[in-house]
Amino acid sequence: MKTLYLPLFFKMKSWIICVLFISFSPILMSQIYEIGFSVGGTNYVGDIGSTRYIQPNQLAGNVFFKYNYNPRIAFKGTYSYLPIKGDDATADTPFRINRNTPAISFSNTIHELALGMEFNFYEYNTSSRTKNWTPYLLIELAAFNYDAIEKEEDLNRNGQIDADEYQYDRKTRIAIPIGVGFKSILSGPIAFALETKIRYTFEDDLDKVAGNNRDLKIEGNSNDWYVFTGVSLIYTFGRPSCYARRN
């Protein structure tokens, strides 16, 4: 009897393996990944300096990893190194230029980890001859770490930091990055992208000056923003996806 059941067992086993392979093959075949880095500039928008949202003045960069879920959607993780600075001497409003003497200035360094989704306006296919470029929208959630003054009393009446007296500490907070960009294949698995990403924070002390400091003539009380604008070099690897049609 055992001899009679053996052929049936092997047939069922082969059938089960075949069904599992067919079921999971789209997942296995869709493993298209991207790694890359960006180089560009940052700028800050807050209580000090220029109020322009895109005006890079500090060299910055990031590294990232992406998983292309389909031709329109990708999941992205990014680490960014983002120095920022502001100086009322280069402000674009008379109020900020003239409010204090000497002019208020600051510098800070932000370390950021972000996770989000990239939405392509057109189908983007690294194996296609025609669908190899697209503008895109990026929405993320980020955790960022920066220097913050612990006590407002550490600032003197002109808004400058008394280096021998002030106390500061690193803070980690949440930001909401939103970006737009354009990407295109260069050659084979190599692509490039141009991107601007602006972050809204829920903090008002990236400039190490709190908006409610009574000794300073602060204009407005909105939270701070920081922006990165740059160019990316991207390498695509992994198995060709199930949607990769060469057309």
Regions found by a protein language model. Give the residues of each.
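Predominantly the C-terminal beta-signal and adjacent terminal strand-loop region
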Residues: 187-247
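Short loop/turn motifs that connect adjacent beta-strands in outer-membrane beta-barrel proteins
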Residues: 28-32, 72, 123-134, 186-189, ...
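Gram-negative (and chloroplast) outer-membrane scaffold detector with strong preference
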Residues: 71-155, 232-237
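Flexible, surface-exposed loop regions and adjacent strand-edge segments
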Residues: 52-56, 91-99, 153-160, 209-216
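Extracellular loop and loop/strand-boundary signature of outer-membrane beta-barrel proteins
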Residues: 45-51, 99-106, 161-168, 216-221
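Residues that define the transmembrane beta-barrel architecture of outer-membrane proteins
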Residues: 31, 55-59, 109-113, 133, ...
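Short glycine/proline- and aromatic-enriched beta-strand/turn motifs that initiate or cap beta-hairpins
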Residues: 28-68, 230, 234-240
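Residues on the lipid-exposed face of transmembrane beta-strands in outer-membrane beta-barrel proteins
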Residues: 37-39, 63-67, 77, 115-119, ...
